[in-house]
Amino acid sequence: MASRQGPLCGLAPCCLWLLGVILLMNASARPANHSSARERAGNREENEILPPDHLNGVKLEMDGHLNKDFHQEVFLGKDMDDFEEDAEPRKSRRKLMVIFSKVDLNTDRRISAKEMQKWIMQKTAEHFQEAVAESRAHFRAVDPDGDGHVSWDEYKVKFLATKGHNEREVAEKIKNKWDLNIDEETQEVLENLKDRWYQADNPPPDLLLTESEFLSFLHPEHSRGMLQFMVKEIIRDLDQDGDKKLSLSEFISLPVGTVENQQGQDVDDGWVRDRKREFEELIDANHDGIVTMAELEDYMDPMNEFSALNEAKQMIAIADENQNHYLEPEEVLKYSEFFTGSKLVDYARSVHEEF
């Protein structure tokens, strides 16, 4: 008996080590995705003055990744936090059916594409209002003298202060045009921010941002010009042949320069499949296999009613098991993970309970 256990015990550490290596390889092989609103964290002061990486109700992130929370953001709106994984299932099912009733405008116990479109536009407007309120508070943080304008130099001082630099010393150096002695990475971030600052500065440019211009700086989805700038940035990062358009192969590839993730590109079939479906069904409006800047801009514009209708149809199609082009209570509950991020069990029984 002892002679049999010895070799097995000796194998255990080896097996554990091998398992760890496999898990590590799998994790590093998958494309980076910083698209979840629930995963964002960081320095609070820095977050207040930096443009957010994630924009609620916008289909693509700033880095070109799909916003994996998008469907929940436009279906739940402010109620997103109520559907965390640890929420009580029965309570969550009831809330989901309350939302269903609100979307179902004609009370026929089914949701049409038009009803879903109106709901998406309503939830997007809520996100817009939240962004305006946040931007107003953040503007006050970078406009200490309260003159209603923020200069690029004022903003730069505040930004470097969040990076650990002494605010008074930085202000003095900028005033006297002395070397700031900042690292290369921070300098690159500053240059990108300055480009964005210029874009948000409405003609005639004076490098002074008003409160509304500062909103566009933080949230490009609020300004046609800044939305176009965001589209150009994304195409620049994904466009491999320099034609200022995107082919399917370019869109499903990782952005140029993310070398650490490219080895895992073929591994993550789900990531590629999702982007392929998005490209073919929603972004490439004329289905010619090429996405232009205009097409990408229409797709990314949160207040584009045509895009909202297409999105509504796609959301219905995903859960429409009886293929009648409507969403019914049973279908919404069964596909609750798609709509809320949480899987709610016993969906069939729940329909009768909640109605």
UniProtKB/Swiss-Prot annotation:
Q: Where does Ca(2+) 4 bind?
A: 284, 286, 288, 295
Name the predominant localization.
Answer: Golgi
Gene Ontology cellular-component terms listed: endoplasmic reticulum; Golgi lumen
Which N-terminal residues, if any, form the signal peptide?
A: 1-29
Query: Where is it localised?
Result: Golgi apparatus lumen
- Residues involved in Ca(2+) 2 binding: 143, 145, 147, 149, 154
Positions binding Ca(2+) 3 in this chain are 239, 241, 243, 245, 250
Binding of Ca(2+) 5, residues: 320, 322, 324, 326, 331
Please state every residue range assigned to the domain named EF-hand: 91-126, 130-165, 226-261, 271-306, 307-342
Q: Which residues bind Ca(2+) 1?
A: 104, 106, 108, 110, 115
Sites where Phosphothreonine occurs are at 186, 210, 258, 292
PANTHER family (UniProt xref): 45 KDA CALCIUM-BINDING PROTEIN (PTHR10827:SF98), RETICULOCALBIN (PTHR10827)
Q: What function does this protein fulfil? A: May regulate calcium-dependent activities in the endoplasmic reticulum lumen or post-ER compartment.
Q: Which family does it belong to?
A: Belongs to the CREC family.
Protein name stated in the entry: 45 kDa calcium-binding protein
Specify the species: Capra hircus (Goat)
